[in-house]
């Protein structure tokens, strides 16, 4: 059975679809069609042949539900805890990442940062600051490829190369992976699960990379978050992200007022931040 939560009170109600799962997989901007799920709010392509096995080239951003059940793979956390997780992709940089860290310190909130290996190499001191201030670091590949278009060897290279960089700078090998664009293939999920990684997508997309205002981002998050929400923001070098930074001063206090607790992904999924 699916559960969704009212953003007003964090009260569960039945969404109306039957499925025996322990997590909530009904974020507002994920699309559901037959046995497939898409995490991209701007993915307008709806597969016409979902009743049969879709070919990889036709699937695009659509993920079979079975992957969530078979692998260490999630879009959101447990629905029975009033927890939400802030996550920031594509950093670090010298402009927005420090501003985000300042805001998080101001509100006494810990978050998860999915870093690119090439940016971590450029800005090692920012990586160290993220780790030293108690935030969790995740693996976002080395240079942000579409993983659905790379072979198995290149996928593994992207992950392991980045892991080595982050381990050297942060002091541990991150357990969590987020695939760029939300794109990943089943063989990649299988290998990652076997290697004790966990792949976490998102359930609320702020679309902050478009340079939208703080009010737009705030309304998006407040209107569509529920217990277990994984919120996607960015700390992209050269991005237009001031609205995303400023929105934190509104999102954090208002969600706390609703009863939400801000946690890192290891806390949400009750596992280690480190791949062991």
Question: What role is predicted for each listed range?
Answer:
Residues 40, 81-84, 94-96, 105-238:
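Metal-dependent polysaccharide deacetylase catalytic core of the NodB/CE4 family, i.e.
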Residues 56-61, 151, 239-240:
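Acidic/histidine-rich helix-loop elements
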Residues 102-104, 194-195, 247-250:
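Glycine-rich, phosphate-binding/catalytic loops in enzymes
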Residues 212-215, 242-246, 274-276:
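Histidine/acidic-residue-rich catalytic or RNA/ligand-binding cores of hydrolases
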Residues 226-238, 243-266:
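Catalytic grooves of carbohydrate-active enzymes
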Residues 1-86, 93-99, 106, 250-253, ...:
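N-terminal pre-catalytic segment of deacetylase/amide-hydrolase enzymes
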């Amino acid at each position: 059975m699916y559960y969704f939560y009212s953003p007003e009170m964090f009260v569960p109600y039945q969404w109306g679809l039957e499925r025996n799962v322990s997590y909530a997989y009904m974020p507002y901007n994920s699309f559901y069609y037959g046995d497939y799920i898409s995490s991209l709010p701007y993915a307008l392509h709806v597969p016409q042949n979902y009743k049969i096995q879709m070919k990889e080239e036709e699937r695009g951003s659509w993920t079979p539900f079975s992957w969530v059940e078979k692998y260490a793979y999630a879009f959101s956390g447990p629905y029975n805890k009033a927890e939400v997780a802030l996550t920031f992709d594509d950093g670090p940089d010298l402009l927005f990442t420090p501003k985000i860290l300042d805001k998080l310190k101001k509100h006494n909130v810990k978050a998860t940062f999915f870093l690119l290996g090439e940016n971590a190499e450029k800005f090692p001191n920012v990586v160290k600051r993220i780790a030293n201030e108690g935030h969790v670091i995740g693996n976002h590949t080395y240079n942000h490829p579409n993983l659905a278009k790379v072979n198995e060897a290149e996928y593994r290279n992207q992950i392991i190369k980045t892991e080595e960089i982050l381990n050297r700078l942060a002091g541990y090998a991150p357990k969590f992976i987020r695939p760029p664009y939300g794109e990943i293939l089943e063989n990649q999920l299988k290998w990652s699960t076997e290697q004790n990684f966990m792949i976490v997508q998102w359930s609320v997309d702020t679309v902050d990379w478009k340079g939208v205002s703080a009010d737009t981002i705030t309304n998006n998050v407040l209107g569509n978050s529920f217990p277990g929400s994984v919120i996607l923001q960015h700390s992209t070098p050269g991005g237009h992200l001031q609205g995303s930074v400023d929105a934190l001063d509104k999102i954090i206090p208002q969600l706390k007022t609703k009863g939400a607790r801000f946690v890192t992904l290891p806390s949400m999924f009750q596992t280690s931040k480190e791949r062991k």
